[in-house]
Amino acid sequence: MNYPSNPNPSSTDFTEFFKFDDFDDTFEKIMEEIGREDHSSSPTLSWSSSEKLVAAEITSPLQTSLATSPMSFEIGDKDEIKKRKRHKEDPIIHVFKTKSSIDEKVALDDGYKWRKYGKKPITGSPFPRHYHKCSSPDCNVKKKIERDTNNPDYILTTYEGRHNHPSPSVVYCDSDDFDLNSLNNWSFQTANTYSFSHSAPY
């Protein structure tokens, strides 16, 4: 193979060796072939790269100039990949045990507004489980309320997720504007702080 002469003998030009212009075309052809097969039985290949690998000019044995970006491959059955992704996004779960001999509405009084979307019997328990979702439009927090089978005087409340908004029962104000001692039914916080009420931790 005849290589072009290098006008600068003190450096080696490798641009002729690094030809990656056809890489994208080749990869697209491979992905088209994979796409023609049955995805339910074939492994799935997912690839991501933000930049191309470009040519390098080596000016000395100790100095290189090579621009690369990481490539990530995820190989496996489609269902397995979905399970792995779901596992990474598991919600934050908190369980509280509250003594209450009245009804489950007491467990709803946590400072947030909830919308009931279901009720389901529990195997081996005379008490059903109630399902609620936060009524704030962009909040995905859910909670389940049920009586403890071993001790019906207690209610188990399971929270999934974390609220992305303050509690509606918390009033934000400037402390100079109000006499805080005269309004005992409210939980006050100063206007320049943004935190959740201790009465509604999740």
UniProtKB/Swiss-Prot annotation:
Residues 103-168 bind DNA. Keywords: DNA-binding, Nucleus, Transcription, Transcription regulation. The keyword Transcription applies. SMART domains: WRKY. One of its GO terms (cellular component) is nucleus. PROSITE patterns: WRKY. Pfam families: WRKY. The keyword Transcription regulation applies. One of its GO terms (molecular function) is sequence-specific DNA binding. This is Probable WRKY transcription factor 59. Belongs to the WRKY group II-c family. Transcription factor. Interacts specifically with the W box (5'-(T)TGAC[CT]-3'), a frequently occurring elicitor-responsive cis-acting element. Gene3D superfamilies: WRKY domain. It is found in: Nucleus.
